[in-house]
Amino acid sequence: MPANAPLLQFTPPLQPATLILRYKRFLADIVTPAGEALTIHCANTGAMTGCATPGDTIWYSTSDNPKRKYPQSWELTQTQTGDWICVNTMRANELVNLAIEKNQIAELSGYNFVRKEVKYGEENSRIDLLLQAEDRRDCYIEVKSVTLLQQQCGYFPDAVTLRGQKHLRELQNRVVNGHRAVLFFAVLHTGIKQVAPARHIDRRYAELLVQAQQAGVEVICYGFQLSPDGIALNTRLPLLLDEMLSSENAE
């Protein structure tokens, strides 16, 4: 159990259901314990490999916004192997921001201001979080949600991401311009104990990640404790780059 207080509490509590099918990227069909069939919103445009297996137990929230066509939102998956996954990718930025504000991430402490979605860079980007203080360099933070588990390792990305490649170039340029730059992997799958770039999925992203780190971009990985009650920050997780570098040198 993490010593940190919960960052996010689900109010009202999440409700369980059985996943029937995820489709059209943004929708999923479920059946509640009472037998009610629902179509719910899925705020995840990724491949969701291993996160959307029919028959898994999913947990959903319900919005009180009367204008929403699909008031229920898919938040968590409880896999048949007992792992928990936060499939709502919008939560990653929120959780990292809350952890910084609550001073739970030592590597990112000591800043007075947190700004969100600030325009920056040579490729017309927006940074997820910009930390500022009078006596420190500006700190640019790009947050990525990690949920792909393969062979006991968490991988990012789960599909080719030109946008993610652009973000790595932008972060590297921030360092060149004298700023601090951080790639923060928010590991939202409780079965993941270590993280690596998914070279087998997006080779260019993996190459850019190595280049960015060598240029001074910091890569920070943290796990989270997930439950239908809420989400808390867990421990820092290792990033595996040495094996990838060794395999590249051998080619």
Curated annotation (Swiss-Prot):
It comes from the Bacteria. It comes from Yersinia pseudotuberculosis serotype O:1b (strain IP 31758). This is Sugar fermentation stimulation protein homolog. InterPro entries: SfsA (IPR005224), SfsA_C (IPR040452), SfsA_N (IPR041465). Belongs to the SfsA family. GO terms for molecular function: DNA binding.
